[in-house]
UniProtKB/Swiss-Prot annotation:
This is 2,3,4,5-tetrahydropyridine-2,6-dicarboxylate N-succinyltransferase. Homotrimer. The gene is dapD. Its EC number is 2.3.1.117. It comes from Janthinobacterium sp. (strain Marseille). GO terms for biological process: diaminopimelate biosynthetic process; lysine biosynthetic process via diaminopimelate. One of its GO terms (cellular component) is cytoplasm. It holds the Pfam family THDPS_N_2. InterPro entries: DapD_Trfase_Hexpep_rpt_fam, Hexapep, Hexapep_transf_CS, THP_succinylTrfase_dom1, THP_succinylTrfase_N_sf, Trimer_LpxA-like_sf. It catalyses: (S)-2,3,4,5-tetrahydrodipicolinate + succinyl-CoA + H2O = (S)-2-succinylamino-6-oxoheptanedioate + CoA. Substrate binds at residues 106, 143. Pathway: Amino-acid biosynthesis; L-lysine biosynthesis via DAP pathway; LL-2,6-diaminopimelate from (S)-tetrahydrodipicolinate (succinylase route): step 1/3.
Length: 274
C-alpha cells in the first residue's frame, strides 16, 4: 500500500501545476488524504532515523505540499465569536475528552496544531503553533508562542522555549525538514530553520539563529561548519571577523561539548556559563 501511495504522489507531483480543487483526480485526492491521515496518527513521518542517519521521505513531503493545491478554503467556526478561513482543519476540532485522554498530551488555550501533525504522549503545548506534517515526540515542551514549522521533526524530551521558531518546508520551500533530536534545549526566541539538524543532548542558548548559511564555529577546534549542530553541543550567538578585519558577521559558537550524563545532571544556565 505504501509503495502504491508513493507512486501516485510522485506522479501527481510532476503534474501538480495542472491540479486545482475542482479538477484533481479522485485517486490523487485519496492518496494525499491517506498520507495526511497517517501523519496525523504518527504512523508515517516525513523523516526518520535509520542506522544513525536521517532519511527524508520526499514523497511524503510532496503529499503535504500537494494537499494545499487540492483543497479550497472553508469557514472554520471557533466558539460563538470567532471563525477562521483556511484549507487545513485543526487537529483537535473534533476531539472528545476520551480522544485527549488517549493522546496523553496537554493543550493549553489557545494552542493550535493543524491536522496532519503528530503530538506524542506527555507533550505539553503551551499557547503555540504546530504545523501540518510536523512530528513532536514524547515528553517534549512547546512553550508559549513557539512555532513548529511544517514537517519539522522534534525528538523526545525536547524543550522549545518561549518564542522559539523551528522552520518548515512550505514557505519558503525547503528540500529537507528542520530536525531537533532527543533531549535538546532550544533557548527563548532562537530560530532553527532551513533543514538544520540539532543533534541529541544539545543546548542552544537564548537568541541563537541558525540557517544553512550560518557559520557554526567550534571554539575548541577553530573549525567552521554549516547546517548541523553535533551531539552534546552547547551553542551561543557570536561573531567572526572578516578577512580584512573591517567588520564582523554573525555566527553560532559551540562553546563546549557535554555528554548525556553531564547534560542530565547540570542545569541549563550552568552549562551556558563560560
Amino acid at each position: 500500500m505504501t509503495q502504491q501511495l508513493e507512486q501516485i504522489i510522485d506522479q501527481a507531483w510532476e503534474n501538480r501545476a495542472d491540479f486545482s480543487p475542482k479538477n484533481a483526480p479522485a485517486d490523487v485526492r485519496n492518496a494525499v488524504a491517506q498520507v495526511i491521515a497517517q501523519l496525523n496518527e504518527g504512523t508515517l513521518r516525513v523523516a526518520q532515523k535509520d542506522s544513525g542517519a536521517w532519511v527524508v521521505n520526499q514523497w511524503v513531503k510532496k503529499a503535504v505540499l500537494l494537499s494545499f493545491r487540492l483543497e479550497d478554503n472553508i469557514t472554520m467556526p471557533s466558539g460563538d465569536h470567532m471563525q477562521f478561513y483556511d484549507k487545513v482543519p485543526t487537529k483537535f476540532a473534533n476531539y472528545t475528552a476520551e480522544d485527549f485522554a488517549k493522546g496523553g498530551f496537554r493543550v493549553v488555550p489557545p494552542a493550535v496544531a493543524r491536522h496532519g501533525s503528530f503530538i506524542g504522549k506527555n507533550v505539553v503545548m503551551m499557547p503555540s503553533f504546530v504545523n501540518i506534517g510536523a512530528y513532536v515526540d514524547e515528553g517534549s515542551m512547546v512553550d508559549a508562542w513557539a512555532t513548529v514549522g511544517s514537517c519539522a521533526q522534534i525528538g523526545k524530551n525536547v524543550h522549545l522555549s518561549g518564542g522559539v521558531g523551528i522552520g518548515g518546508v512550505l514557505e519558503p520551500m525547503q528540500a529537507n525538514p528542520t530536525i531537533i533530536e532527543d533531549n535538546c534545549f532550544i533557548g527563548a526566541r532562537s530560530e532553527i530553520v532551513e533543514g538544520v539538524i540539532v543533534e541529541e543532548n544539545s543546548v542552544i542558548s537564548m537568541g541563537v539563529y541558525i540557517g544553512q548559511s550560518t557559520k557554526i564555529y567550534d571554539r575548541a577546534t577553530g573549525e567552521v561548519t554549516y547546517g548541523r549542530i553535533p551531539a552534546g553541543s552547547v551553542v551561543v550567538s557570536g561573531n567572526l571577523p572578516s578577512a580584512d578585519g573591517k567588520y564582523s558577521l554573525y555566527c553560532a559558537v559551540i562553546v563546549k561539548r557535554v555528554d548525556a550524563k553531564t547534560r542530565a545532571k547540570t542545569g541549563i544556565n550552568e552549562l551556558l556559563r563560560d
